[in-house]
Amino acid sequence: MDKHYIYIVKCKDGSLYTGYAKDIEKRIIKHNNGQGAKYTKIRRPVQLVYQEMFDTKSEALKREYEIKTFSRQKKLKLISEG
């Protein structure tokens, strides 16, 4: 069964980016090679600071959407509670 992930990366400028991936390692490499999201392209390098795993893409995308609505402080709390 495939696994699905949501992740948060910390960008060079200190901002946080939340995304979805089936393979986090490959996705982080893409972000750092400028092949990821437009947002991270100009904020490289990025560093993985948080991840969650799900059994279905639907669950992962729902959680990604939820986290994207969080304030920066709420995201930092989530990261620190790991």
From Swiss-Prot:
Which family, according to the similarity comment? Belongs to the UPF0213 family.
Name-wise, this protein is UPF0213 protein SSP2268
Read off the PANTHER family from this record: UPF0213 PROTEIN YHBQ
What InterPro entries does this protein's entry cite? GIY-YIG_endonuc (IPR000305), GIY-YIG_endonuc_sf (IPR035901), UPF0213_domain (IPR050190)
* Pfam families for this protein: GIY-YIG (PF01541)
Q: Where is the GIY-YIG domain?
A: 2-77
